[in-house]
């Protein structure tokens, strides 16, 4: 997952459904191609951490340049409590015109509450990722503008110090585990205190790739045996001392930025959002200066490994939705903004500041890797631009509940408090008791 928190979805649903009973949403009167006219219009749009998250202002300014009569005014929310605050504003009628969908899990809740406008009439460019995550009962309720995917970050200098060849894009999980062992031995022999791997404490570091890659994977099915080999690989690396153990990571509140950015680890699986952070921190000195690159995440089998294939990974989109209670006179302008946010021009604007857009093509890739501090090797470009990305969080009303008990399973396995088999069996039982056939 990205550094986000799940809100209490049950509470959100109750608040939104109550709001839906008291008023009805306006009906879309124009499609994404309709003109907003030339009259001055001000749209409000939600965002968070505006001083350190430039994507909102970047898109608002670029859109205004193309549509001088339309101003997009940003409304800042606390990043940690974003969805709780947004739920309250939607229920009270204080939410902005355009709502940034930070967490996919809330889409069904907002849609069921009648809080989002149906934007199915907005035509999206071919090849855009993440659109299906915003579809509920056949209707689209948001448009993706960014799509982060998980890749393998690696420190080229530490690989060289350990005398281990860099990743070549062909690794399976067995190759990854083998490389971790060689790296750990090589780094120790070279007198380095760095570990081969840093695995953050999130459940997604194991489960996200299992869900995307393993045969029979998918959290909505309620049977989690398919995750077993992924936990076996993770525990093997941990037990061999090639990474800080889970209890150390959680007790000491280690950060992935600090561990990789300060060269405490040679490899780390993380989402592409970290690229912009690492470039920025190397520029400010908060991260060390070293040579780094990206490779595809290790694959379940050789069928998807290698640069002649399409590697499988995971990640959720971030998108824009329209408040169902927007002034009808602003609907066309809001849809024009969503149409722009999904366009190639918007993708280039995002790529130029190190953000991974939902639309990736050769021109966008060139723009992204022209950013000062970005890696320039061909494998990094391949890893960033070529992949099949499955959602971390399926768009389903039960997703938040399922992810909660799967997080408990993850903690039990990685901390050693339960065996893999026992923890998976408990998760299967939790699905039956908490979700069942709902």
Question: Which residues does each PLM region occupy?
Answer:
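Short helices/loops that flank or line small-molecule/ion binding pockets
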Residues: 83-94, 113, 158-159, 177-182, ...
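Conserved N-terminal structural module of periplasmic/extracytoplasmic solute-binding proteins
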Residues: 2-108, 166, 286, 301, ...
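C-terminal capping/gating helix-and-loop segments adjacent to ligand/active sites or protein-protein/ligand interfaces
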Residues: 363, 377-430
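Extracytoplasmic/periplasmic substrate-recognition and gating elements
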Residues: 162, 239-243, 283-353
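A local structural motif
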Residues: 66-77, 94-95, 163-168, 235-251, ...
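Hinge/lid segment of periplasmic solute-binding proteins
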Residues: 102-149, 293-295
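Short helix-initiation/N-cap motifs at beta->coil->alpha
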Residues: 76-85, 105, 171-177, 247-261
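Glycine-centered hinge/linker elements that transmit conformational signals in sensory
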Residues: 180, 219-250, 300
């Amino acid at each position: 997952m990205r550094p986000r928190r799940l809100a209490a979805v049950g509470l959100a649903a109750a608040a939104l459904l109550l709001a839906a009973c008291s008023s009805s949403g306006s009906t879309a009167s124009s499609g994404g191609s309709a003109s907003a006219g030339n009259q001055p219009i001000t749209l409000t749009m939600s965002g968070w951490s505006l001083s350190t998250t430039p994507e909102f202002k970047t898109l608002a300014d670029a859109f205004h340049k193309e549509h001088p009569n339309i101003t997009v005014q940003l409304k800042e929310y606390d990043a940690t409590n974003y969805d709780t605050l947004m739920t309250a504003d939607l229920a009270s009628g204080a939410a902005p015109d355009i709502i940034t969908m930070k967490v996919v899990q809330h889409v069904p809740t907002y849609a069921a509450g009648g809080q989002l406008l149906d934007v199915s009439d907005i035509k999206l460019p071919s090849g855009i990722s993440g659109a299906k995550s915003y579809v509920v009962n056949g209707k689209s309720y948001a448009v993706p503008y960014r799509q982060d995917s998980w890749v393998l970050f690696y420190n080229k200098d530490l690989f060289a110090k350990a005398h281990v060849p860099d990743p070549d894009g062909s690794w399976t999980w067995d190759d990854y585990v083998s490389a971790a062992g060689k790296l750990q031995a090589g780094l120790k022999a070279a007198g380095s205190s760095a570990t081969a791997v840093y695995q953050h404490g999130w459940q997604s570091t194991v489960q996200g790739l299992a869900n995307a890659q393993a045969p029979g994977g998918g959290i909505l099915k309620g049977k989690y045996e398919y995750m077993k080999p992924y936990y076996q690989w993770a525990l093997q690396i941990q037990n061999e001392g090639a990474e800080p153990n889970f209890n150390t990571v959680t007790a000491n509140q280690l950060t992935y930025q600090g561990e990789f950015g300060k060269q405490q680890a040679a490899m780390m699986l993380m989402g592409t959002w970290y690229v912009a952070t690492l470039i920025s921190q190397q520029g400010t000195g908060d991260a060390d200066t070293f040579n780094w690159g990206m490779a595809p995440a290790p694959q379940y089998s050789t069928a998807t490994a290698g640069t002649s294939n399409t590697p499988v990974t995971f990640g959720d989109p971030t998108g824009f939705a329209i408040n169902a209670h927007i002034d009808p006179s602003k609907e066309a302008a809001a849809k024009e903004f969503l149409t722009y946010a999904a366009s190639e021009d918007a993708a280039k604007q995002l790529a130029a500041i190190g953000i991974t857009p939902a639309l990736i093509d050769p021109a966008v890739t060139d723009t992204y890797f022209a950013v000062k501090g970005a890696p320039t090797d061909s494998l990094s470009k391949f890893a960033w631009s070529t992949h099949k990305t499955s959602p971390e969080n399926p768009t389903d009303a039960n997703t938040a509940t399922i992810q909660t008990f799967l997080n408990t399973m993850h903690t039990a396995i990685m901390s050693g408090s339960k065996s893999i088999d026992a923890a998976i069996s408990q998760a299967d039982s939790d699905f039956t008791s908490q979700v069942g056939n709902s």
